[in-house]
UniProtKB/Swiss-Prot annotation:
<dbReference type="GO" id="GO:0005109">
    <property type="term" value="F:frizzled binding"/>
</dbReference>
<keyword id="KW-0325">Glycoprotein</keyword>
<keyword id="KW-0964">Secreted</keyword>
<dbReference type="GO" id="GO:0005125">
    <property type="term" value="F:cytokine activity"/>
</dbReference>
<feature type="disulfide bond">
    <location>
        <begin position="85"/>
        <end position="95"/>
    </location>
</feature>
<dbReference type="GO" id="GO:0045165">
    <property type="term" value="P:cell fate commitment"/>
</dbReference>
<feature type="lipid moiety-binding region" description="O-palmitoleoyl serine; by PORCN">
    <location>
        <position position="1"/>
    </location>
</feature>
<protein>
    <recommendedName>
        <fullName>Protein Wnt-4</fullName>
    </recommendedName>
</protein>
<dbReference type="InterPro" id="IPR005817">
    <property type="entry name" value="Wnt"/>
</dbReference>
<keyword id="KW-1015">Disulfide bond</keyword>
<feature type="glycosylation site" description="N-linked (GlcNAc...) asparagine">
    <location>
        <position position="86"/>
    </location>
</feature>
<dbReference type="GO" id="GO:0030182">
    <property type="term" value="P:neuron differentiation"/>
</dbReference>
<dbReference type="GO" id="GO:0060070">
    <property type="term" value="P:canonical Wnt signaling pathway"/>
</dbReference>
<feature type="disulfide bond">
    <location>
        <begin position="69"/>
        <end position="100"/>
    </location>
</feature>
<dbReference type="InterPro" id="IPR043158">
    <property type="entry name" value="Wnt_C"/>
</dbReference>
<keyword id="KW-0449">Lipoprotein</keyword>
<dbReference type="Pfam" id="PF00110">
    <property type="entry name" value="wnt"/>
</dbReference>
Length: 119
């Protein structure tokens, strides 16, 4: 019939939130590794022998993160002292985690706003 059909395919990134969730999951399960020389090859093995060997899909790291609790200008860490935390959260914004066991002061604040409600 003389007509042509063109099919074009392309790869697209998933939504940013999905990428972030996958990275966070990998970060939470990351394995600390060290280099070992086996023959003439250098391989990465878990620093803790009780951990399973990592796969090509796993996130691994060689050096531990600095202690983010304390002020450390050398590593660019501002520390967490004086920061506002969420008393009910179990995540990184929660007081138990953010305050690094130093304890925290609570403050109850009442905010009154006009809401332009119509009855």
């Amino acid at each position: 019939s003389g007509s042509c059909e063109v099919k074009t395919c392309w790869k697209a990134m998933p939504p940013f939130r999905k990428v972030g969730n996958v990275l966070k999951e990998k970060f939470d399960g990351a394995t600390e590794v060290e280099q070992k020389k086996i023959g003439s090859a250098k391989v990465l093995v878990p620093k803790n022998s009780q951990f399973k060997p990592h796969t090509d899909e796993d996130l691994v790291y060689l050096d531990s993160s600095p202690d983010f609790c304390d002020h450390d200008l050398k590593n660019g860490v501002l520390g967490t002292a004086g920061r506002q935390c969420n008393k009910t959260s179990k995540a990184i914004d929660g007081c138990e985690l953010m305050c690094c066991g130093r304890g925290f002061h609570t403050e109850e604040v009442e905010i009154v706003e006009r809401c332009s409600c119509k009855f």
